[in-house]
Amino acid sequence: MSKDVIEYSKLFAKLXNTNDDTKLDDTIASFLYYMFPRELFIRAISLLESSDMFIYILDRVHNKEGNEHTSLIDVLVDEFYKGSSNSLLEYRLIVKDTNDGAPPILVDIAHWFCSCEEFCKYFHEALEKTDEKEELHDVLINEVDDHLQFSDDRFAQLDPHSLSKQWYFKFDKXCCSHLLAFSILLRSSINVLKFFTVNSNKVFVIAIDNIDEWLNLHINIVE
């Protein structure tokens, strides 16, 4: 699965059915199923349809009048798809753990991290297989400094705003359904984002305009 050949984010973008905005494209979904191990893609889609995924946005200036939900989606579109956000958006990607009493799962696609057991397991396995002479950076990150080799793919991309280099986390070393699900949502297309947040209303976008509530969100994650 070479980054030079496959642009995953473009494949994710085709998941939304162009003829019916209430359905996913079965052909693209079937193709993606075989591109990830451990039924990872199926688990990611199931997660997107589970109503257990949340995007919390620290909202200091949001106008509470009118359609708040649509406005929040516009904020996400500006941040992840148009790059037109005037300020750094503070947000958290959270998944409700289905195990009773377990803390919420924190997902960070910008730095390719997830607090779930699956990600930690494969991350540590990658570390154990690392030769003592190898740098961790070389083991887990693919660095591209040749502009001719640059890719438009945004899946597992780190620091996408750099103009001199591209970095991709080697997701075949460590990936989980949570990272894949949020990547499908936020590293694909506006249509896919709206499919899960607006059309099917399975992923919830929630504004927090109180700093105390924002801090409590983080406390609940680490407890």
Swiss-Prot record:
GO terms for biological process: DNA recombination; DNA repair. Signal peptide: none annotated. One of its GO terms (cellular component) is nucleus. Keywords: DNA damage, DNA recombination, DNA repair, Nucleus. It is found in: Nucleus. The keyword Ligase does not apply. Plays a role in a RAD51/RAD54-dependent homologous recombination repair (HRR) pathway to repair MMS-induced lesions during S-phase. Required for error-free repair of spontaneous and induced DNA lesions to protect the genome from mutation. Belongs to the SHU2 family. Component of the SHU complex composed of at least CSM2, PSY3, SHU1 and SHU2. This is Suppressor of hydroxyurea sensitivity protein 2. It comes from Saccharomyces cerevisiae (strain Lalvin QA23) (Baker's yeast). The gene is SHU2.
